[in-house]
Amino acid sequence: MLDILRDNPLLLLFIVAGIGYPLGRVRIGGIHLGVAAVLFVGLAFGALDPSLKLPEIVYQFGLALFVYCVGLSSGHGFLRSFRGKGVIYNLLTLGVILLAAALLLIPHYLLSLRPGETAGVFAGLLTSTPALAAAVEYLTRAGAAGQLSDPVVGYSIAYPASVLGVILAIYLAERCFRIDYRAEARTLKDVPGVSPEITCWTLRVCRPKAFGRTVRDLVAEHRLQVVFGRIRRGDHADVVSWETHLEEGDLVTAVGPVEELERAAQVIGCVSEVQADLDRSEVDMREVFVSNPEVAGRTLRELNLPNRFGAVVSRVWRGDLQLLPYADMPLELGDRVRVLSRRERQQEVAAYLGDSYRAISEIDIAVLGLGMALGIGLGLVPIPLPGGITVRLGLAGGPLIVALFLGARQRTGSLVWVLPYSANMLLRQMGLTIFLAAVGTRSGYEFAQMLTQPRGWAILGASAAIIVLLSWVMLYVGYRWLRIPMGLLTGMVAGMQTQSATLGFALDQAGNDLPTVGYAMVYPMAMVVKIVLAPVIIAVLT
């Protein structure tokens, strides 16, 4: 059987994925590994024979595909995150990484580790292959060819312990703080990846200060975060525009979170018992898929639907996430939008947005290939650092940074960079599964061999203890002191660790896309800092 698997890496890949993926759904004591279970199944198979490993190209392909898709979906939120507390979040991550380097001095001296081994444990502890490469390159430049295996050994031991340790820390934090991700998501505002619960109220204009005022003036003056849909004046109904003047007795529908609707009611009058949204005789609503490439990547402000069609977008569904539209929200391929317009213009609006389910099931391979090529190319560019060290962003950093940039831009001319939500999720999951299966089989044998030695167990135990402590410190400080939402924070922990498996677990636990925002927010800084620190550790300890 081993000979068959050795000679057929594709068979090995699908067996590891086929066993690991369903195994990750099994809950033990309320916890499940999710897609991260593929990594541990890969380790088990890799431990059986040194030649039982997937080709390097498989690992590279899965990693590049996964991080590129994560970057595309996080690009818009990544830039928005730095308008608020993004700097604080990155400083927290930086502090934890520096703490990791400091704590490694304990096992370095207690276990008499060589500098290269300590640097390898650092890279494995924070699961950074680029940092491992930087450590190996430093030893090569220093003429220490006989020590090139030291970082690799330390990395192979610490890596699996680190992944499991962080997952354990997240699980303990969820239990300790009694996290309810759904309840948490409902309370969040202006955070990419989640949306508070949205509902529709009918408001009656009965406050004198609102009489004769335009919707634009009232929204700007009171900063109302609601979408006004239709207005009923006497027996006549129409779609609300920015220039609509409100008169006494008007019935206006508004969509938004309950607390914002309460504010809107206080501004213009009161809540009406009449449900004006049920009257569809003149103004109707229709849910439409965004499938027109000419529309994708453009903001609602650019599309200017009220002036073009007399239409208003009142809700946007992206995957399972229901979003409240705002002027600078870019529409993406695969979005499902609820459009209000006069009945005679419904078909016209739908045709403009696309409304083709088949179209959003297709992927522009040319654009996908171009984007990934740009990312892989960036990862190959050598970056000189002080001390004669040259590093590269690699397959993890290059595609992610390019994808963050492209995801923020959404489109360039006729090129639509973002993928339909369903296609992005499919490619992301496939890439992550391939990556985990490959890295598990490639590390399994060395990992098993080191565990036959007491020293290997000591390094493993120290690595596990340090990463659990680091993760717990980050989770506790972030949640208790900085009041960071746990969904965002678990993604930040995965970004600090630059670990796709941890992100997969965090996504499974949260049930929304908030962890990807935290991951993308801190990943670039974390990756660069670890690349710099790995050779510095060797230089300082030599």
From Swiss-Prot:
Primary localization class, coarse: membrane
Compartments where found: Cell membrane
Pfam families named in the record: Asp-Al_Ex (PF06826), TrkA_C (PF02080)
GO BP: potassium ion transport
Lipid bilayer topology: Multi-pass membrane protein
Listed GO CC annotations: plasma membrane
Transmembrane spans: 4-23, 28-47, 57-79, 86-108, 151-173, 365-384, 389-408, 415-437, 457-479, 484-506, 519-541
Domain RCK C-terminal: 186-270, 273-356
Keywords: Cell membrane, Membrane, Repeat, Transmembrane, Transmembrane helix, Transport
UniProt GO molecular function: monoatomic cation transmembrane transporter activity
NCBIfam families cross-referenced by the UniProt entry: YidE_YbjL_dupl
PANTHER family reported in the protein's UniProt record: K(+)_H(+) ANTIPORTER SUBUNIT KHTT, TRANSPORT PROTEIN YIDE-RELATED
The family this protein is said to belong to: Belongs to the AAE transporter (TC 2.A.81) family.
Protein name (Swiss-Prot/TrEMBL): Uncharacterized transporter STH2172
Organism: Symbiobacterium thermophilum (strain DSM 24528 / JCM 14929 / IAM 14863 / T)
